[in-house]
């Protein structure tokens, strides 16, 4: 996102969008475009993000099973929602797109967010918004805080159909995704302990291992 955002800035565009190439459904990109357009047409703030929520995530293996949630997404969303619940005092499942590779945002928002690398990119975007605009930690972006940050999660009609990649790939995704929550200043010590246990239980981390810190790219505009 950081490199793509820089190219968009140089071309003076208002939006930047991302898609993943592992969806086997014909016409998937056309649906993404309509979802992004719908989200931005609803936005009242110039600082807006649209994240695709999959209707189903079936895998291609020996047989077809239409699973509602991806395994990594289910775990990531659990801890994203735990952070929100902890800060608000209300249990919630509102955050459903913690690992949404298909997403778009206005350049006004894109240029003030820090980014992580690899599979930590999408969770870090949300964590960056929580930290900078959650109303608890101080922010250096007063104009954006005044306008408000809008995040739209829009569900597809088509499923996200892709091949089964195995447990090793899931572990490779889970570790960086949860690490951004683990090291966030926004999370509580209790959530930090839960994440550590989760990664050990999922086989993504050995009991004696330290969770690696994600590499964070600073905002393109301070």
State the predicted function of each range:
Residues 30-40, 69-83, 123-124, 168-183:
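Well-ordered, non-membrane alpha-helical segments in soluble/globular domains
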Residues 62-63, 85-120, 131-138:
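Aromatic-glycine-rich donor-binding/catalytic loop that engages nucleotide-sugar donors
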Residues 119-222:
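C-terminal catalytic/acceptor-binding lobe
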Residues 12-14, 44-50, 149:
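Short, high-confidence coil segments that cap the C-terminus of an alpha-helix
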Residues 13-24:
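Short beta-strand-to-loop acidic/aromatic patch adjacent to the donor-nucleotide binding site
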Residues 25-56:
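Conserved donor-nucleotide/metal-binding helix-loop-beta segment in metal-dependent transferases, i.e.
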Residues 2-15:
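Active-site nucleotide-sugar/metal-binding loop of Leloir-type enzymes
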Residues 44, 48-58, 62, 69-95:
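Short, flexible, basic/aromatic active-site loop/helix in glycosyltransferases
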């Amino acid at each position: 996102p950081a490199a793509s955002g820089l190219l968009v800035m140089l071309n003076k565009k208002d939006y930047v969008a991302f898609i993943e190439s592992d969806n086997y459904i014909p016409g998937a990109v056309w649906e993404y475009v309509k979802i992004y357009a719908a989200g931005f047409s609803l936005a009242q703030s110039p600082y807006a993000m649209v994240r695709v929520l999959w209707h189903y995530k079936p895998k291609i293996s020996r047989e077809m099973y239409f699973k509602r949630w991806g395994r990594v997404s289910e775990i990531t969303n659990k801890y994203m929602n735990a952070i929100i619940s902890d800060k608000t005092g209300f249990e919630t499942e509102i955050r459903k797109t913690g690992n949404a590779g298909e997403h778009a945002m206005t350049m006004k928002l894109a240029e003030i967010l820090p980014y992580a690398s690899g599979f930590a990119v999408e969770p870090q975007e949300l964590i960056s918004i929580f930290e900078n605009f959650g109303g608890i930690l101080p922010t250096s972006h007063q104009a954006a805080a005044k306008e408000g940050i809008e995040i739209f999660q829009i569900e597809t009609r088509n499923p996200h159909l892709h091949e089964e990649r195995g447990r090793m790939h899931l572990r490779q995704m889970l570790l960086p995704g949860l690490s951004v929550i683990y090291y966030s200043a926004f999370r509580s010590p209790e959530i930090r302990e839960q994440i550590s246990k989760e990664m050990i239980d999922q086989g993504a981390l050995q009991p004696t291992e330290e969770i690696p810190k994600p590499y964070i790219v600073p905002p393109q505009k301070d």
